[in-house]
C-alpha cells in the first residue's frame, strides 16, 4: 500500500466515512491519529513494547473525545501477562505485575478487566519466564539504542526499575550479561557495531565480587551495607566511553559511630541497631558466609576493622587493601561495582519511599506482603553467620538475636502446614521434635504482654506455583504458639510414622483477604 493510499484511509476514518480501519503490521509506531477512540485487538501481541505502541494509537487527546475503549479479543493467549506489563510499565517482576493488576487507574486513566480475563492473566503471570534471554536481550538493545552506548544498571533502572535485578541475575553478574550481549550483537546476519572493546578483562575474584554485589546489594533490601560501602568508597561518576580515565583511590578509615549515624540519617525508618550494623559488617568482611558461599563470592573481604584512637569506641572501618587495589587498577571492575552499588541504593530508597507512601511500618527489617529468599531472611534477621537451607529446614532458632523465622511451602493437605483462617495456621514441627525441644521451650518462655519484645517469629509462605523462584511472602510475625501437642505423621517413605509437634500459629494481625486468596489458590 502506498503512503498516499494510507493517508486517504486515515482521512476517511477521521472524518467518519469509515467506522473501522483494520491493519496488519502497520500503525505500531510513528502514526498519529488523535481522533481514534476505539482500538480492537484481534491477534496476539508477543512484545509489551509493540502492545504499548498499538495502545498508544488511541491515547491522544482530541476535541469531544473523553476516553478510548480497548476491546481485546485475544486475552487468552499464552503471553497475556504482557497486558499488565505494558499498561503499568513493569517488565521484570512477577509479583509487582500481579499487584498492578489490582490497580484501577493509571494517572487519569481507569482500567478494568472482566473476571475471566483477570483470572487468565494471573495464571499466565505464574507460568511466564521473566528471565527469558530473548526478552531481556530485546530490552537491553532498546536501552542501548536510545543511549548509543553500553547501558549501565542505573540506565536500566531509569528505563524500568523492576529490570536491573532480573537482568543482572540472568548471568553471573551484570558485566557478564553485558559482555555476552555485546558478543552476540557482533555476530549473526543482523550484526551491529559492538562496544565489547570497552570492557577490560576481570579476574575470577573480581567477577565473584560482582556476583555477590548483584545478589546481595542490588536488591536494596537493607541499607546498611550500601551506606557503609558508599561512605568508604567515595566513587566518582565515570563512564566506559570516557576519553580520559578517572583517578580513584581509597579514602581514610571511618569510625563506627559515624557510619551508624549515616545509616540512621539517610534511612530513619530502618533498624539502626548495633545488631543490624554488626550483621552488615560481617557480610562485608565475609565472616558471615558459609564456606561454599564465601568461595562463590571470591573469598575476598571488602572491608576490615582497624583500631582508631580518634573514634568514640576505638573502632573504625576501611576498604580491605586488596579489594581497594582491584578497584584502583581495573576501571571496568570499578565502574560496574560502583554502578551496582548505586542501583542498589536507588532500589533501597524506592522500598523505603513506597513503604512511607503506603504508611507501612517495617516489622524489624521486613515489609508485609514483600517476598524474600531464605538467604535474605537470615541476613535481615541480623544473624552474624548464615546457615545452609538444609539446616534451616522449615525454621531455625538463632538465640543470639532471639529470632526464629518460619518458612512454609504451601500445599494444603492432611499432613501439611495449612491456614485455618486469615490469622491462624496449623503447623507441623521438624521431624522428631517435641514440646520439650529447645525451640518450643524458647517459644513458650515468658508468655505474656511483653513476649514480643524478647521473641521475633516472622512467618514466610511460598506459593506452590512460585516454587521455582525460591521466595516467600512475608505475612507477619507470630504472636503465639497455641496448644503445642506431640503427634505423628507419615514418614517420607509412607510406610511408617515420625513424631512431630503440632501447634497453631497465631499471627499478630490477619492476612489481607487478597493476599490470602493468592496464597491458598
Stretches with model-predicted labels:
Residues 1-28:
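Conserved helicase ATPase core of P-loop NTP-dependent helicases/translocases
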Residues 21-36, 56-58:
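SF2 helicase motor core recognition
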Residues 44-53, 57-90:
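Conserved segment of the helicase C-terminal RecA-like domain
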Residues 86-232, 239-244:
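Long, largely alpha-helical accessory region at the distal end of helicase-like NTP-driven motors
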Residues 194-388:
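C-terminal accessory/interaction regions of large nucleic acid-associated machines
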Residues 208-217, 232-233, 250-256, 260, ...:
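Acidic, glycine-rich low-complexity segments with interspersed aromatic residues
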Residues 466-521:
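Compact mixed alphabeta submodule
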Amino acid at each position: 500500500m502506498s503512503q498516499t493510499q494510507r493517508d486517504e484511509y486515515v482521512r476517511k476514518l477521521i472524518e467518519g466515512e469509515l467506522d473501522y480501519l483494520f491493519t496488519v503490521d502497520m500503525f505500531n509506531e510513528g502514526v498519529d491519529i488523535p481522533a481514534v477512540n476505539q482500538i480492537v485487538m484481534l491477534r496476539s501481541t508477543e512484545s509489551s513494547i509493540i502492545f504499548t505502541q498499538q495502545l498508544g494509537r488511541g491515547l491522544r487527546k482530541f476535541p469531544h473525545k473523553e476516553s478510548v475503549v480497548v476491546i481485546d479479543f485475544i486475552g487468552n493467549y499464552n503471553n497475556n501477562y504482557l497486558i499488565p506489563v505494558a499498561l503499568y510499565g513493569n517488565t521484570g517482576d512477577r509479583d509487582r505485575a500481579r499487584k498492578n493488576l489490582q490497580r484501577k487507574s493509571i494517572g487519569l486513566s481507569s482500567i478494568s478487566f472482566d473476571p475471566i480475563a483477570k483470572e487468565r492473566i494471573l495464571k499466565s503471570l505464574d507460568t511466564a519466564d521473566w528471565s527469558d534471554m530473548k526478552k531481556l536481550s530485546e530490552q537491553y538493545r532498546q536501552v542501548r539504542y536510545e543511549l548509543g552506548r553500553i547501558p549501565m544498571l542505573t540506565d536500566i533502572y531509569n528505563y524500568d526499575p523492576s529490570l536491573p535485578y532480573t537482568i543482572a541475575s540472568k548471568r553471573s553478574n551484570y558485566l557478564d550479561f553485558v559482555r555476552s550481549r555485546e558478543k552476540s550483537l557482533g555476530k549473526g546476519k543482523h550484526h551491529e557495531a559492538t562496544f565489547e572493546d570497552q570492557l577490560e578483562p576481570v579476574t575470577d575474584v573480581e567477577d565473584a565480587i560482582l556476583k555477590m554485589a548483584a545478589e546481595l546489594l542490588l536488591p536494596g533490601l537493607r541499607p546498611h551495607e550500601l551506606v557503609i560501602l558508599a561512605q568508604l568508597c567515595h566513587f566518582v561518576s565515570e563512564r566506559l566511553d570516557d576519553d580520559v580515565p578517572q583517578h580513584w583511590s581509597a579514602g581514610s578509615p571511618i569510625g563506627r559511630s559515624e557510619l551508624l549515624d549515616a545509616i540512621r540519617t539517610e534511612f530513619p525508618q530502618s533498624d539502626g541497631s548495633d545488631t543490624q550494623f554488626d550483621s552488615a559488617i560481617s557480610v562485608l568482611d565475609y565472616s558471615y558466609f558459609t564456606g561454599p558461599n564465601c568461595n562463590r563470592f571470591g573469598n575476598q573481604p571488602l572491608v576490615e576493622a582497624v583500631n582508631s584512637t580518634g573514634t568514640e569506641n576505638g573502632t573504625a572501618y576501611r576498604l580491605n587493601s586488596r579489594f581497594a587495589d582491584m578497584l584502583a587498577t581495573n576501571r571496568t571492575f570499578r565502574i560496574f561495582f560502583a554502578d551496582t552499588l548505586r542501583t542498589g541504593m536507588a532500589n533501597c530508597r524506592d522500598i523505603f519511599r513506597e513503604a512511607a507512601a503506603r504508611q507501612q511500618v517495617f516489622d524489624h527489617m521486613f515489609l508485609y506482603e514483600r517476598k524474600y529468599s531464605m538467604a535474605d531472611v537470615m541476613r535481615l534477621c541480623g544473624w552474624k553467620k548464615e546457615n545452609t537451607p538444609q539446616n534451616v529446614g522449615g525454621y531455625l532458632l538463632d538465640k543470639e538475636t532471639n529470632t526464629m523465622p518460619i518458612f512454609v511451602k504451601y500445599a494444603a493437605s492432611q499432613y501439611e502446614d495449612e491456614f485455618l483462617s486469615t490469622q491462624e495456621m496449623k503447623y507441623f514441627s521438624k521431624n522428631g521434635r517435641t514440646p520439650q525441644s529447645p525451640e518450643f521451650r524458647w517459644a513458650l518462655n515468658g508468655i505474656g504482654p511483653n513476649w514480643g519484645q524478647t521473641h521475633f517469629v516472622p512467618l514466610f509462605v511460598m506459593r506452590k506455583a512460585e516454587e521455582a523462584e525460591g521466595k516467600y511472602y512475608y505475612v507477619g510475625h507470630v504472636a503465639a504458639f497455641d496448644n503445642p501437642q506431640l503427634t505423628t505423621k507419615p514418614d517420607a517413605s509412607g510406610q511408617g510414622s515420625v513424631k512431630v509437634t503440632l501447634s497453631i500459629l497465631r499471627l499478630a494481625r490477619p492476612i489481607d483477604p487478597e493476599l490470602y486468596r493468592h496464597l491458598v489458590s
